[in-house]
C-alpha cells in the first residue's frame, strides 16, 4: 500500500512538472498579446472615419466664458439689468455678432482634438443665442436669423393690430343698403373678406308702415291706449345716438321675455330690412324717456304743455315777486328788464317752433341751418320727441309770468300816482299792449 501511494505521488509530481515546462512558455506569448490589445488598438485623439465605435468623452477642465454671479437673484431688484449671467462688469459686451464669432472660434480651439460630432454637445451655445435675443436692437436683428420657421407664426401673431384709417365702415348701420364703396387702395385689403351678396341689396320697406302696436306705460287702466310704432321709428331707435340693443328694444316695444326673444326680434327686423347685430351695446344712457315710444312721449309733452298753460300760477307768482320790488325808483328799471326778458323768450320759442326733427311717420323739410338742426334733432332723438315740446311748454309758462308781472307793475304805478290824467294812462297802456304783442 505504501509503495502504491508513493508511486501515485511521484506520478502526479511528474505531471505537474511536465505541465509547467510545456505550458509555461506558451502562456507568455498569450499574456503578451492580451496585454497589448487595448493599447495597440486604441484610436488616436483625432477623428476617425469609423462610425461604429465612439470613444468615451472626457472633457478637459475649462474656464466658463460667462462667469456666474454669486447671488442668483441679484438681477431681480434691478429692472434695467441686461442679463443675470452678466453680473460682473466686462469691458466689452459678449452679445455682439462680431465678438460672438470670435468666442465661437476660441471655443472650438479649446475643444481641439475631440471628435467633431461632440462640439454640438456644449449647452452654452444655446444660452448664448438666447442671450443675444435679450439685448438691444442690433443683437435682436442678428438673432432673428437663428429663429426657426416654426417660430415665425408666433412672432407674427404678437404684432399689434393696426387699423387702416382709410377704411371707414361704420358698424352702427342698421339699414341694409347697396354694397359699400371702397377706394382702389383699400379694395385689395378688403378683398379677402367674405361678403354675402344677399345682405347687400334691398333696403327698408315703407318707413310709414306700422311695425307693431305698443300699449302705453303711463296710462291708467281705465284709459289704456295703444300707440302705433312705424318702421321709421324702429330705425331711429337702432341708429345713433341711442343704438339700442335687442334687450332694450324689446322693452320699448313691450315684447314678452322668452328664451329666443332676441333672435326672433332680429329675424323680424331682418324681414323689414333692418340689421340688429347680436351682442350689441347701447351708446347712450338709459332714462325713463327711453322706455317710451314716440307717440306716448309726444302725448306726455302735449299734456305737460296743457298743464303749464292752464294750471301754472303765473299771476300769483308775478304779484308775489312784484311786492318784493315795490320801490318806485326801481319800477322803471324793472319794467325794462321784464320787457327785454320777454323778447328773449320770444326769440327762443320762435327758434324751437322752426324745429323739423323727424317724428312718428313725418319727416318734414328742414328750415333751419344744418348745424343747429342737427343739434335739435339729437335732442329729440334722445328724448323720443318729448324734448322740444316740453321746453316750449316751460318757456310758455315763463312768458305767462312775464305778462302777469308787467300787468301788476302797471297797477302799482297807477296806485302810486293817483293825480295822473286818465288820458295819459290810457295812451301809455295802449302803447304797452302794442309792445307786448
From Swiss-Prot:
Modified residues (Phosphoserine): 239
Covalent cross-link (Glycyl lysine isopeptide (Lys-Gly) (interchain with G-Cter in SUMO2)), residues: 10, 177, 184
UniProt keyword terms in alphabetical order: Activator, Disease variant, DNA-binding, Isopeptide bond, Nucleus, Phosphoprotein, Transcription, Transcription regulation, Ubl conjugation
Effect recorded for residue 239 to A: No phosphorylation
One GO cellular component, as annotated: nucleus
Chain ranges for the short sequence motif PPxY motif as given in the UniProt record: 57-62
Biased composition (Low complexity): 65-74, 88-101
Compartments, record wording: Nucleus
One GO molecular-function entry: identical protein binding
Pfam families in the cross-refs: TF_AP-2
UniProt key word Ubl conjugation: yes
Annotated stretches, region: H-S-H (helix-span-helix), dimerization: 280-410
Keyword DNA-binding appears in the UniProt entry: yes
UniProt-annotated stretches for the region Disordered: 14-107, 414-437
Ranges of Polar residues composition bias in the record: 414-427
Residues in cross-link Glycyl lysine isopeptide (Lys-Gly) (interchain with G-Cter in SUMO): 10
Basic and acidic residues composition bias: residue spans: 428-437
Reported modifications of this chain: Sumoylated on Lys-10; which inhibits transcriptional activity.
GO BP field: bone morphogenesis; cellular response to iron ion; embryonic cranial skeleton morphogenesis; embryonic forelimb morphogenesis; eyelid development in camera-type eye; inner ear morphogenesis; kidney development; negative regulation of apoptotic process
Complex and partners: Binds DNA as a dimer. Can form homodimers or heterodimers with other AP-2 family members. Interacts with WWOX. Interacts with CITED4. Interacts with UBE2I. Interacts with RALBP1 in a complex also containing EPN1 and NUMB during interphase and mitosis. Interacts with KCTD1; this interaction represses transcription activation. Interacts (via C-terminus) with CITED2 (via C-terminus); the interaction stimulates TFAP2A-transcriptional activation. Interacts (via N-terminus) with EP300 (via N-terminus); the interaction requires CITED2.
Record's disease association: Branchiooculofacial syndrome: A syndrome characterized by growth retardation, bilateral branchial sinus defects with hemangiomatous, scarred skin, cleft lip with or without cleft palate, pseudocleft of the upper lip, nasolacrimal duct obstruction, low set ears with posterior rotation, a malformed, asymmetrical nose with a broad bridge and flattened tip, conductive or sensorineural deafness, ocular and renal anomalies.
Protein function: Sequence-specific DNA-binding protein that interacts with inducible viral and cellular enhancer elements to regulate transcription of selected genes. AP-2 factors bind to the consensus sequence 5'-GCCNNNGGC-3' and activate genes involved in a large spectrum of important biological functions including proper eye, face, body wall, limb and neural tube development. They also suppress a number of genes including MCAM/MUC18, C/EBP alpha and MYC. AP-2-alpha is the only AP-2 protein required for early morphogenesis of the lens vesicle.
Protein name: Transcription factor AP-2-alpha
Gene: TFAP2A
Amino acid at each position: 500500500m505504501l509503495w502504491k501511494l508513493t508511486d501515485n505521488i511521484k506520478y502526479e509530481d511528474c505531471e505537474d512538472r511536465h505541465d509547467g515546462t510545456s505550458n509555461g512558455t506558451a502562456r507568455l506569448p498569450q499574456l503578451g498579446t492580451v496585454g497589448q490589445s487595448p493599447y495597440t488598438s486604441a484610436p488616436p485623439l483625432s477623428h476617425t472615419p469609423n462610425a461604429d465605435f465612439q470613444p468615451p468623452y472626457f472633457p478637459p477642465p475649462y474656464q466658463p466664458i460667462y462667469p456666474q454671479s454669486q447671488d442668483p437673484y441679484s438681477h431681480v431688484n434691478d429692472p434695467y439689468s441686461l442679463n443675470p449671467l452678466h453680473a460682473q462688469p466686462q469691458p466689452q459686451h459678449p452679445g455682439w455678432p462680431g465678438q460672438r464669432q470670435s468666442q465661437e472660434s476660441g471655443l472650438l480651439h479649446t475643444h481641439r482634438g475631440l471628435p467633431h460630432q461632440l462640439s454640438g454637445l456644449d449647452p452654452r451655445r444655446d444660452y448664448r443665442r438666447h442671450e443675444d435675443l435679450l439685448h438691444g436692437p442690433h443683437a435682436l436683428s442678428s438673432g432673428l436669423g437663428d429663429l426657426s420657421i416654426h417660430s415665425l407664426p408666433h412672432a407674427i401673431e404678437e404684432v399689434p393690430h393696426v387699423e387702416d384709417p382709410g377704411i371707414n365702415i361704420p358698424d352702427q348701420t342698421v339699414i341694409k343698403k347697396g354694397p359699400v364703396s371702397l377706394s382702389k387702395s383699400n379694395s385689395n385689403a378688403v378683398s379677402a373678406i367674405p361678403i354675402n351678396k344677399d345682405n347687400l341689396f334691398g333696403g327698408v320697406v315703407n318707413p310709414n308702415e306700422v311695425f307693431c302696436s305698443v300699449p302705453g306705460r303711463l296710462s291708467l287702466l281705465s284709459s289704456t291706449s295703444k300707440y302705433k310704432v312705424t318702421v321709421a321709428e324702429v330705425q331711429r331707435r337702432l341708429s345713433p345716438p341711442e343704438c339700442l340693443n335687442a334687450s332694450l328694444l324689446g322693452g320699448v316695444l313691450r315684447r314678452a321675455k322668452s328664451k329666443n326673444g332676441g333672435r326672433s326680434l332680429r329675424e323680424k327686423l331682418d324681414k323689414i330690412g333692418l340689421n340688429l347685430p347680436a351682442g350689441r351695446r347701447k351708446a347712450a344712457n338709459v332714462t325713463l324717456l327711453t322706455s317710451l315710444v314716440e307717440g306716448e312721449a309726444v302725448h306726455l309733452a302735449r299734456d305737460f304743455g296743457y298743464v303749464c298753460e292752464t294750471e301754472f300760477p303765473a299771476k300769483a307768482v308775478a304779484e308775489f315777486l312784484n311786492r318784493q320790488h315795490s320801490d318806485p325808483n326801481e319800477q322803471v328799471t324793472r319794467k325794462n328788464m321784464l320787457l327785454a326778458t320777454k323778447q328773449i323768450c320770444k326769440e327762443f320759442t320762435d327758434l324751437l317752433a322752426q324745429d323739423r326733427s323727424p317724428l312718428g311717420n313725418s319727416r318734414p323739410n328742414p328750415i333751419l341751418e344744418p348745424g343747429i338742426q342737427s343739434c335739435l334733432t339729437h335732442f329729440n332723438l334722445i328724448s323720443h320727441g318729448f324734448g322740444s315740446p316740453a321746453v316750449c311748454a316751460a318757456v310758455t309758462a315763463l312768458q305767462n309770468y312775464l305778462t302777469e308781472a308787467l300787468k301788476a307793475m302797471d297797477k302799482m304805478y297807477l296806485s302810486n300816482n293817483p293825480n295822473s290824467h286818465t288820458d295819459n294812462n290810457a295812451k301809455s297802456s295802449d302803447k304797452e299792449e302794442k309792445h307786448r304783442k
